[in-house]
A protein has these predicted regions:
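Positively charged n-region of N-terminal signal peptides that target proteins for export
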Residues: 1-6
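Bacterial N-terminal signal peptides
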Residues: 8-18
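Sec/Tat signal peptide C-region and signal peptidase I cleavage site
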Residues: 18-24
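Compact, glycine-rich, soluble single-domain proteins
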Residues: 24-155
Length: 155
């Protein structure tokens, strides 16, 4: 019986951590960045690509970011010829696929900022994926494109 207690404890700890380990082991956050806006603004947007190399869907239900009072998932939709932002309760990343949070579509709203981050400043960005946080660094940038897009030449 004395041997079973430590085994049960270890097993219990592993099971308690399994959602976090599963999310961290499967979700890959790439190309995260935050849009730099004038310092008078209280909100801004963040962008990231979420890859799911795993066999099960990933569900993003929210997150957090340094300097932000809260983070919301939003989509840009056309309503009566006007572009509108709509809050999303969740975003699903199918198995083996990726979802891009990018300008003009799905994006992350960073609301109630303590202050606007300066261009070049790096913020910690975390998404709640399958019930566990998955974090990355996001550089604050001016403009709308990622560095890769800014340096491409079109002929």
């Amino acid at each position: 019986m004395k041997v079973l207690k430590p085994v049960a404890c270890v097993l219990g700890c592993v099971l308690a951590l399994s959602p976090a380990l599963a999310a961290q082991g499967q979700a890959v956050l790439e190309d995260a960045w935050v849009r730099a806006l004038p310092p008078t603004q209280a909100n801004t947007a963040a962008y990231v690509t979420v890859r799911n190399p795993g066999p099960e869907p990933l569900v993003i239900t929210g997150g957090s970011a340094a300097l932000a009072g809260r983070l919301e998932l939003h989509d840009t939709v056309e309503v009566d010829g006007m572009l509108r932002m709509r809050q999303q309760e969740s975003v699903t990343v199918p198995a083996g696929e990726a979802v891009a949070f990018a300008p003009g579509g799905l994006h992350l709203m960073l609301l109630d900022l303590e202050r606007m981050p300066a261009a070049g400043e790096v913020l910690k960005l975390c998404l709640e994926i399958n019930g566990a946080p998955v974090c990355t660094d996001a550089e604050t940038r001016r403009g709308q494109a990622s560095p890769d897009r800014e340096h491409q030449h079109h002929h």
